[in-house]
Amino acid sequence: MTTVSMRDMLQAGVHFGHQTRYWNPKMKPFIFGARNGVHIINLEHTVPMFNEALAFISNVASKKGKVLFVGTKRAAGEAIKEAAISCDQYYVDHRWLGGMLTNWKTVRQSIKRLKELESQSVDGTFDKLTKKEALMRTRELEKLEKSLGGIKNMGGLPDVLFVIGADHEHIAIKEANNLGIPVVAVVDTNSAPDGVNYIVPGNDDAMRAIRLYTTSVAAAAKAGRGQDLAVQAEQDGFVEAE
């Protein structure tokens, strides 16, 4: 089972919150104190809460569930994308489009258009167009890929959202809440934990902290998927009893 230790979190700077003047009182239970005007997050809470969240994500993945990684802040985008791809899951790393979950029918049409344009770009269709028309379609393809590339193969709504920065991604969290999709989110001292099912109190800006969260969630999803494949193989008669 994937777990993260106190040492891992200390080394990554998970405990450093925001300046005290920007705090959200709803995060008070998770704050240890303050140092040099910066809130210090109590890792005695964060360690078990994150490990509980990892166990939940692993369980979702073990049932063929879809995990959607969400992190559109500049610091989080790259790590979110890499982690999601590494565990064969899905991501939104650029901008959360309003209705991405609650208006899935429309999003599905945009994904269909994206796939059409992808096919046209490789089957020679673009070469037969005028220069202007080809350029317009290329731009449309790039725009759609940027917005929807990480969810184009999701094939339906996700089973869990993993979010870096609850404050920044409040629209995504609200949409998930409306649809009853569980949310795991890193919540810093300046944010509200509202609508988050699995709260991970921690720094949501430092690259090392973000990498720790994303790689751990990816490992948990992979481990869960591995359990699913092992069970499937056993059912199919591929695993011999010792």
Curated annotation (Swiss-Prot):
List the Pfam families: Ribosomal_S2
Query: Does Ribosomal protein show up as a keyword for this record?
Result: yes
UniProt name for this protein: Small ribosomal subunit protein uS2
Q: Which GO terms describe its molecular function?
A: structural constituent of ribosome
**NCBIfam families, alphabetically?**
rpsB_bact
Q: Which protein family is it in?
A: Belongs to the universal ribosomal protein uS2 family.
Q: Which gene encodes it?
A: rpsB
Q: Which species expresses this protein natively?
A: Shewanella sp. (strain W3-18-1)
User: Which is a GO BP term held by this UniProt record?
Assistant: translation
Q: What is the lineage of its organism?
A: Bacteria, Pseudomonadati, Pseudomonadota, Gammaproteobacteria, Alteromonadales
A GO CC annotation recorded here is: cytosolic small ribosomal subunit
**Which PANTHER family does this UniProt record tie to the protein?**
30S RIBOSOMAL PROTEIN S2 PROKARYOTIC AND ORGANELLAR, SMALL RIBOSOMAL SUBUNIT PROTEIN US2M
What keywords tag this UniProt record?
Ribonucleoprotein, Ribosomal protein
- Which cysteines in this chain are paired by disulphide bridges? none
